[in-house]
Amino acid sequence: MNESERKIVEEFQKETGINFKNEELLFRALCHSSYANEQNQAGRKDVESNEKLEFLGDAVLELFVCEILYKKYPEAEVGDLARVKSAAASEEVLAMVSRKMNLGKFLFLGKGEEKTGGRDRDSILADAFEALLAAIYLDQGYEKIKELFEQEFEFYIEKIMKGEMLFDYKTALQEIVQSEHKVPPEYILVRTEKNDGDRIFVVEVRVNGKTIATGKGRTKKEAEKEAARIAYEKLLKERS
């Protein structure tokens, strides 16, 4: 870690209250592959992406969610538990948890990802959260993960069990827009951009011809979903 990287790692610990014995683990958890690739190409060999931690974190998360379900819902059918487990460990939920702790603010991203909104992209936030879980597990053990996140995941799991959890932002946005404007929202592909050789789709969601949000993604579908999420959250905020 260089000094500027160490400063961000220390700021993360101060802001979240999650303190690491081995700060290198935390640094690695916050390093997106785009940043690691840039640094490696610049001659640094000490920067590793969070992909391996994400791999471990996926397994830690599954155990964590399964344990909550096993203890809290002893009468539930296995099929129902599997459905809820899948929803509770979904990209959408992990991105929600990440936003709540402001995880995106501390991520190390390559220039291309930074420019195309990667800091607030569901997939990047979810992957980083899994990497963070693995880093905490390796640094402080499984009980620390339960101490930090059990209450929050119990909240989401309960809402999923009750059928109250909303993941389909496009459907949710359509319901609001049609009730208020009597027309469905439109999704318009406005351009594509290049990011480290990959295509990034840029989609606007419009109501009566007026753009209310813009989303970016590696596929048109992902960009539409991101635009719908931003528009939905914007409309909810305006209503409150």
Curated annotation (Swiss-Prot):
GO biological process: mRNA processing; regulation of gene expression; RNA processing; rRNA processing; tRNA processing
SUPFAM superfamilies linked to this entry: dsRNA-binding domain-like, RNase III domain-like
pH effects: Optimum pH is 8.0.
Entry keywords, A to Z: Cytoplasm, Endonuclease, Hydrolase, Magnesium, Metal-binding, mRNA processing, Nuclease, RNA-binding, rRNA processing, rRNA-binding, tRNA processing
EC number(s) from the headed UniProt entry: 3.1.26.3
GO cellular component assignments: cytosol
Residues in DRBM domain copies: 168-237
Top EC class for this record: hydrolase
GO molecular function, one term: double-stranded RNA binding
Cystine pairings recorded for this chain: none
One family name in Pfam for this protein: Ribonucleas_3_3
Thermal properties of activity per the entry: Optimum temperature is 40-70 degrees Celsius.
Binding site for Mg(2+): E54, D127, E130
Catalytic activity as recorded in UniProt: Endonucleolytic cleavage to 5'-phosphomonoester
Subunit structure, interactors included: Homodimer.
Stated role: Digests double-stranded RNA. Involved in the processing of primary rRNA transcript to yield the immediate precursors to the large and small rRNAs (23S and 16S). Also processes some mRNAs, and tRNAs when they are encoded in the rRNA operon. Probably processes pre-crRNA and tracrRNA of type II CRISPR loci if present in the organism.
Protein's name in the database: Ribonuclease 3
Native species: Thermotoga maritima (strain ATCC 43589 / DSM 3109 / JCM 10099 / NBRC 100826 / MSB8)
Gene: rnc
